[in-house]
Amino acid sequence: DRIFVLEQRGTIYVFQNDYSVTEKTMFLDIRDKVVHEGERGLLGLAFHPEYENNGYFFVNYTAPNPLRTVVSRFQVTPDNPDVGDELSEHIIIQIDQPFSNHNGGQIVFGPEGYLYIGMGDGGWFGDPYNNGQDLTTLLGTILRIDVDTVSATL
């Protein structure tokens, strides 16, 4: 019944799924964590399969110093399902990025409940480090993570 809109700069808004709605609600604001020039920014959002019960949602964003991809879990505030708790961030994985482009960003839950993360090759024209073919790096891969394990951190 709701529509969530991500902005590359690091904000997520929520709207009621009604054509007459004219107001937006800030669901999450992590602009202070996100670098958002070029192909970087807040790049993905996925809701846990048990979201209605646990309020968990996941985001993929690029962070500065050092430049890296971050996939984190957040939770909605206990008193309002239209507001994410910025202080609830639990970082699942961080991967350094050698360049400012080709960072990937898509995240989605599969039918078995695992979180799939599309990692770009780390960038620049022609993949100069050959990350897309290098089996020793997580760049240029699709990661599959069971976020319900005890550690749920890599």
Positions of predicted regions on the chain:
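Acidic, Gly/Ser/Thr-rich repeat motifs that build Ca2+-stabilized beta-propeller blades
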Residues: 1-126
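Secondary-structure boundary elements
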Residues: 109-116, 145-154
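Beta-propeller blade signature
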Residues: 70-80, 130-148
